[in-house]
A protein has these predicted regions:
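Bacterial N-terminal signal peptides that target proteins for export
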Residues: 4-24
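Flexible, processing/modification-adjacent segments and terminal tails
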Residues: 40-52, 117-119, 124-196, 202-204, ...
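N-terminal mature ectodomain segment of secretory-pathway/periplasmic proteins
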Residues: 45-52, 56-138, 172-175, 330
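Gly/Pro-enriched, hydrophobic low-complexity segments
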Residues: 114, 180-273, 442-444, 451-452, ...
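Zn-dependent metallo-beta-lactamase
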Residues: 254-318, 416
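Conserved beta-strand hairpin/beta-sheet module of binuclear metal-dependent hydrolase folds
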Residues: 296-342, 438-456
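Active-site metal-binding motif and surrounding structural segment of the metallo-beta-lactamase
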Residues: 331-376, 476-481
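Divalent-metal (often Zn2+) His-rich catalytic cores of metallo-beta-lactamase-fold enzymes
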Residues: 470-504
Length: 504
């Protein structure tokens, strides 16, 4: 019996030891579930307090529409004089009606840059159709514009708090954060690309800021923070009277609400969209459409990569390719590179030349860097391009963010040449009011000059840009037959000279 008892004790102990990891895992899972439930409960309390501070959940649910008039200063991030310059401002005032019951928005604005003409805009956006009117000219809104408006309406604080109340399982606490000198409590709402973090004032319980992190071709992780202040009553609901938006710490817009009202009787004719516009409405695609790139031959071994609003110049130099301009986005650059691999099998892109730093012309640079392509850029923009490659990229990781080697980024000197012979391309500094640090690409054998933004070849040519290009050509002593645009088409040199001789 003692022996049997000993055997039984040993067997029982062994089984207990074998069960220990499973028991520990179960306890950890239970603790984890309890922690999640606690975080959700704490987050729900913050959201409920915010709803009460704004007038109560019932008042928020009773909002059929909100009308506000405003003035604003909007700053064009990515369109500065240099990468380090302050963003250029556009001043705007207007009125917006968010019709939540009808899922539509009416916008009426007037805006102008400091020295520019007034631009009058009116927009009506519904889930299925949109109208864009600029200085009296009406067009159908793009599908992407309708998506942006719908997302913005959902992101208004009165709608965001309601969505949080209705979806407590999607809430979780985040560590406190200091915002404008005060410690705020944060709640993460949703998951994935739609996730937002809302920060609440500990004294007023009102939402102070909403933060969203998305992927950006220039900034990598783009942290957009919308800050709300000066909350005042509007028909039983508190709404903010000042709204600031900053992107990675840089102010993008400052809006002052001069009046706000709720549940107005709407005039249906204000939202009317002519049949001629409605018939041209494009459905919202389930996924972004594929980008198509076509290679249009300019001359022997020289092509323009076309498709959409932005173009690149491609020069084959023996066993490698030079690409001038990487505009718009990662997707655009991938489409260009895929097209070149298909057309020139075994002939890699060895050098990329961006013309200038403006974001719509540099949004595709990172993809070239990630694929190991060396970059030659104006000396003013070297650090800007290196910054693109070094930007943290956790939302959409790439080869660089995973530890890949950064290719060389070098400065173009005075009339730097890439290659020799008939495919040699010269990089020329182009003085212009458009920006500092602009390059033009000149292929001497074909007498073509590739430029972006300074001049857009089309039915008419801008006199100012034509004069700037003509002055540079004369100063360099080069001969040009055609100007190839990064936008638009191709202009004969005689037309450029003629346009440059006209008054504005």
């Amino acid at each position: 019996m003692p022996l049997c008892g000993h055997r039984f004790a040993m067997t029982t102990t062994s089984k207990a030891l074998r069960r220990a990891p499973a028991l520990a895992a179960a306890l950890l899972a239970l603790h984890g579930a309890s922690s999640v439930a606690t975080a959700q409960a704490e987050a729900t309390v913050l959201v409920q307090r915010a709803a009460t501070a704004m007038g109560g959940a019932a008042a928020l649910r009773s909002l059929n529409n909100v009308t506000f008039e405003f003035n604003a200063a909007n700053f064009g991030l990515g369109q500065e004089e240099t990468p380090a310059s302050p963003a250029r401002a556009t001043f705007q005032f207007g009125r917006i009606i968010n019709d939540y019951r009808g899922s539509r928005r009416l916008t009426t604005t007037e805006s102008r840059v400091v020295t520019g003409a007034v631009q009058r805009q009116r927009g009506v956006v519904t889930p299925t159709v949109g109208l864009s009117e600029i200085n009296g000219v009406q067009t159908a809104s793009a599908a992407a514009a309708r998506v942006n408006v719908a997302n913005d309406m959902r992101a208004q604080p009165e709608r965001l708090i309601l969505a949080a109340l209705d979806n407590p399982a999607l809430l979780t606490m985040v560590p406190p954060k200091r915002i404008r000198g005060e410690t705020m409590d944060g709640v993460r709402m949703g998951s994935g690309a739609e996730a937002r973090t809302v920060w609440f004032d500990r004294l007023t319980h009102l939402p102070v800021a909403v933060e969203r992190v998305t992927d950006d071709p220039i900034l990598g992780d783009r942290r957009t923070t919308t800050l709300y202040t000066r909350w005042e009553d509007a028909g039983g609901v508190k709404l903010p009277r000042e709204v600031d938006v900053d992107v990675n710490g840089r102010l993008q817009s400052h809006q002052v609400v001069t009046s706000a009202s709720v549940n107005a009787t709407l005039t249906e004719s204000d939202f009317a969209i002519p049949d001629s516009i409605a018939q041209r409405a494009q459905p919202i695609p389930p996924a972004p459409p594929a980008i198509t790139v076509m290679l249009a031959e300019i001359g022997p071994n020289v092509w323009r990569a076309e498709g959409g609003s932005h173009h690149s110049l491609v020069i084959r130099q023996g066993d490698g390719l030079v690409v001038v301009e990487a505009p718009q986005s990662t997707a655009r650059s991938k489409a260009v590179l895929d097209t070149l691999r298909s057309r020139f099998a075994g002939v890699p892109v060895k050098t990329l030349v961006p013309t200038h730093h403006h974001w719509d012309h540099s949004g595709g640079i990172r993809e070239y860097l990630a694929q190991g392509v060396a970059v030659v850029v104006h000396s003013r923009n070297v650090e800007f391009v290196r910054g693109i490659g070094a930007a943290p990229k956790t939302v959409a990781p790439d080869a660089l963010s995973r530890g890949g080697r950064m290719p060389t980024v070098s400065a173009a000197g005075n009339a730097t040449s890439i290659g020799t012979g008939d495919t040699r391309v010269m990089l020329l500094d182009l003085p212009t009011v458009h920006a500092e640090g602009v390059l033009a690409a000149y292929v001497p054998s074909l007498r073509i000059l590739f430029v972006s933004d300074v001049l857009t070849p089309g039915p008419t040519l801008a006199p100012a840009g034509s004069r700037e290009i003509a002055a540079m050509v004369r100063a360099r002593g080069i001969v040009v037959d055609r100007v190839v645009g990064g936008h638009g088409g191709i202009a004969a040199w005689a037309d450029v000279e003629r346009a440059g001789s006209r008054d504005q």
